[in-house]
């Protein structure tokens, strides 16, 4: 069970920054 929790945490640690960066990029592109 612990390994599953760590796996999910690792996925979120990767997806959250990527999602924030992608959202910022889209806002910049729309602004231009």
Swiss-Prot record:
GO annotation (BP), single: photosynthesis
First-listed, main subcellular location of the protein, grouped into a coarse class: membrane
UniProt keyword annotation of Membrane present: yes
Cell compartment(s), UniProt: Cellular thylakoid membrane
Annotated TM spans: 9-27
Family, per entry: Belongs to the PetM family.
NCBIfam families in alphabetical order: PRK11876.1-2
Record protein name field: Cytochrome b6-f complex subunit 7
Gene: petM
